[in-house]
């Protein structure tokens, strides 16, 4: 298993962007396009924390069903989960998981 440092280097080479968050000092944001996920370094390598979501300003919107339709929701904000956004998030997750 590659070290977290090697995994991060490979993610950057693949076009992902890394970001730290004060509220989550032990984790690191991994972004590509409008998609975002939190990862945490462990002795076994990087581990995905929770579910990837859609970046909505400085917060991550999670995919939920509200009022019978899918939306990304974060702190009272909602964003329509169009088929294109849902597909982009699925591609992001699959690509990210291939590095973890």
PLM feature segments, named:
Residues 37-79:
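Intrinsically disordered, low-complexity regulatory segments enriched in Ser/Thr/Pro
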Residues 1-33:
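Negatively charged, low-complexity tracts enriched in Asp/Glu with abundant Ser/Thr
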Residues 22, 27-29, 39-41, 57-61, ...:
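Generic local-structure boundary detector
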Residues 2-4, 25, 41-43, 52, ...:
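Proline-rich intrinsically disordered, low-complexity coils
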Residues 2-4, 70-100:
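N-terminal non-globular leader segments, chiefly Sec-dependent signal peptides
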Residues 14, 26, 33-35, 44-46, ...:
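Generic structural motif recognizing short loop/turn segments at the entrances and edges of beta-strands
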Residues 16, 21-24, 54, 72, ...:
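Phenylalanine-focused residue identity feature
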């Amino acid at each position: 298993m590659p070290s977290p440092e090697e995994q991060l280097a490979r993610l950057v080479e693949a076009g992902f962007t890394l970001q730290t968050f004060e509220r989550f000092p032990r984790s690191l944001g991994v972004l590509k396009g409008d998609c975002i996920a939190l990862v945490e370094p462990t002795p076994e390598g990087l581990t995905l924390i929770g579910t990837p979501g859609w970046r909505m300003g400085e917060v991550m919107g999670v995919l939920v069903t509200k009022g019978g339709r899918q939306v990304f929701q974060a702190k009272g904000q909602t964003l329509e989960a169009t088929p294109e956004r849902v597909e982009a998030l699925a591609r992001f997750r699959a690509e990210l998981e291939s590095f973890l």
